[in-house]
C-alpha cells in the first residue's frame, strides 16, 4: 500500500461519511461543527484512490483530537498502521470516541493512554405518557424574545445559553425552540436540534429552578420526542456525566443509555 494523507473537504468525503453513518446508526456528534468549518478534515488515499478519511476537532483553535476515522472494509486489515500514519501527519494529540463507534473506540484503546469517560448518549426505547395537568408546550416565537432574553442570555438558560439578544433572535428564527408553560409562566425550555445526519435530531431541555422536582422535565422530553417523530426524525439525546438529574429525567422519559464518550491522549510514536 502507498498511503497518503492530505487535507480535503467534507463534500469530497461525503460518500464515505454516508457509509460511516450507516455503520454507526446514530447521530454524528460533531456534524454541526463539521458543516460550519470548525474541524480539520483529511482524506486517506492509496495509490490515488480515496479509501478513507479522518476528522479532527478540539476546543478553540486546537483542532487536534480525532473524532472520526473511517476506512473502507477491504482496507481494515491495515487500520492500525494507517491510523498511526494519519495521526503523525495531522499532529493529532488525542482521540475521542463513543463506545458504539466500534472502529474508533478500538483505536482509542490501542493507541491512547489516560482514558477518561465523558457524556452519556441516549436512544429512545419507549413511550412513557407523563400525567402533569396544567402544562402547555408550544413553539417559541419572536413574540417571546423579550421574556426569554433575561433567561437565555444568563446561566439559567444553560445548555441553550446564548451570548446576547441578537443571537437569541436568530435561534428563535431557526424554529428549534419549544416553551413549556404552567400557570406561573415559563416553566422550561426544550429544543429539537436539526442539522445532524438523517434521520436523527438531537433533543434537550432545561427546567426553570422554581419548577423543578415536579415531573416537568419528563413531560417536556416526551412532548419534544413526540414532535420529533412527527417531523419524520428519530430523537437522540446526551448529557454530561455530572448531570444526574438530567440523566434520571431522560431514563424516566423512555430513553436508554446507548453509548458513553471516551477521550484518550495519544501515546508518543517511536
Where are these regions (language model features)?
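Short amphipathic alpha-helix that is part of the acyltransferase structural core
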Residues: 1-27, 127-161
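Active-site rim helix/loop that mediates acceptor-substrate recognition in acyltransferases
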Residues: 21-41, 157-179
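Acyl-donor-binding surface of acyltransferase catalytic domains
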Residues: 58-63, 70-135, 264-266
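Conserved acetyl-CoA-binding loop-helix of GNAT-fold acetyltransferases
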Residues: 75-88, 213-228, 247-252
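Glycine/small-residue-rich hydrophobic helix-like segments
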Residues: 176-234
Amino acid at each position: 500500500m502507498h498511503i497518503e494523507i492530505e487535507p480535503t473537504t467534507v463534500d469530497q468525503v461525503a460518500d464515505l461519511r454516508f457509509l460511516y453513518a450507516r455503520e454507526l446508526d446514530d447521530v454524528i456528534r460533531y456534524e454541526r461543527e463539521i458543516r460550519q468549518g470548525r474541524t480539520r478534515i483529511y482524506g486517506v488515499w492509496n495509490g490515488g484512490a480515496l479509501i478513507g478519511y479522518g476528522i479532527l476537532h478540539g476546543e478553540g483553535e486546537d483542532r487536534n483530537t480525532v473524532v472520526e476515522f473511517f476506512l473502507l472494509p477491504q482496507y481494515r486489515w491495515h487500520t492500525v498502521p494507517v491510523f498511526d500514519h494519519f495521526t503523525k501527519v495531522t499532529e493529532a494529540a488525542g482521540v475521542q470516541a463513543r463506545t458504539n463507534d466500534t472502529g474508533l473506540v478500538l483505536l482509542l484503546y490501542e493507541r491512547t493512554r489516560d482514558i477518561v469517560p465523558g457524556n452519556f448518549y441516549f436512544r429512545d426505547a419507549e413511550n412513557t405518557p407523563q400525567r402533569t395537568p396544567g402544562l402547555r408546550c408550544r413553539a417559541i416565537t419572536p413574540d417571546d424574545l423579550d421574556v426569554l432574553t433575561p433567561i437565555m442570555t444568563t446561566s439559567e438558560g444553560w445548555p441553550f445559553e446564548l451570548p446576547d439578544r441578537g443571537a437569541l433572535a436568530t435561534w428563535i428564527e431557526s424554529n428549534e425552540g419549544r416553551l413549556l408553560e404552567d400557570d406561573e409562566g415559563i416553566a422550561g425550555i426544550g429544543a429539537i436540534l436539526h442539522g445532524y445526519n438523517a434521520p436523527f435530531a438531537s433533543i434537550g431541555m432545561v427546567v426553570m429552578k422554581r419548577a423543578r422536582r415536579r415531573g416537568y422535565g419528563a413531560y417536556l422530553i416526551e412532548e419534544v420526542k413526540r414532535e420529533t417523530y412527527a417531523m419524520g426524525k428519530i430523537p437522540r439525546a446526551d448529557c454530561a456525566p455530572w448531570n444526574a438529574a438530567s440523566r434520571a429525567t431522560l431514563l424516566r422519559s423512555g430513553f436508554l443509555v446507548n453509548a458513553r464518550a471516551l477521550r484518550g491522549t495519544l501515546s508518543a510514536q517511536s
